[in-house]
């Protein structure tokens, strides 16, 4: 139980630290001009690997291009984030897209169809 609580706490700290690094320190053109939100971090039980889920609102690049740039910058992001979160071993980070807008779009489409049916 204590280990589970510790992992949740470290997940929260990592999410905040990684988000700050992406916002303030990463100068990659495919990252710095995008709206990127770190939605959650899932740390492995051995604390050596972390899956970082991001939501990307494309502006100049596609989400896939931005995700590739994040993956390429993962080492730098981990290095900078490790300065803010002190752990014996800083986890290797892996980025994944979490499409939080897709369910919202689906619901809006359903509501629009219902409104259209009510008009007829």
From Swiss-Prot:
It comes from the Bacteria. It is found in: Cytoplasm. GO terms for cellular component: cytosol. Its main location: cytoplasm. The keyword Transmembrane does not apply. The keyword Cytoplasm applies. GO terms for biological process: maturation of SSU-rRNA. One of its GO terms (molecular function) is ribosomal small subunit binding. Keywords: Cytoplasm, Ribosome biogenesis. It holds the Pfam family RBFA. Monomer. Binds 30S ribosomal subunits, but not 50S ribosomal subunits or 70S ribosomes. HAMAP family: RbfA. One of several proteins that assist in the late maturation steps of the functional core of the 30S ribosomal subunit. Associates with free 30S ribosomal subunits (but not with 30S subunits that are part of 70S ribosomes or polysomes). Required for efficient processing of 16S rRNA. May interact with the 5'-terminal helix region of 16S rRNA. Belongs to the RbfA family. This is Ribosome-binding factor A. It comes from Chlamydia caviae (strain ATCC VR-813 / DSM 19441 / 03DC25 / GPIC) (Chlamydophila caviae). The gene is rbfA.
């Amino acid at each position: 139980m204590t280990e589970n609580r510790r992992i949740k706490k470290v997940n929260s700290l990592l999410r905040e630290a990684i988000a700050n690094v992406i916002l303030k320190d990463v100068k990659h053109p495919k990252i710095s001009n995008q709206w990127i939100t770190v939605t959650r971090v899932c740390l492995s039980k051995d604390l050596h690997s972390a899956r970082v889920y991001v939501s990307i609102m494309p502006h100049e690049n596609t989400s896939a291009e931005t995700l590739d740039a994040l993956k390429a910058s993962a080492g730098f992001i981990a290095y900078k984030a490790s300065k803010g979160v002190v752990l014996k071993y800083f986890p290797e980070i892996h980025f994944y897209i979490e499409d939080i807008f897709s369910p919202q779009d689906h619901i809006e489409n359903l509501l629009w169809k219902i409104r259209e049916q009510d008009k007829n």
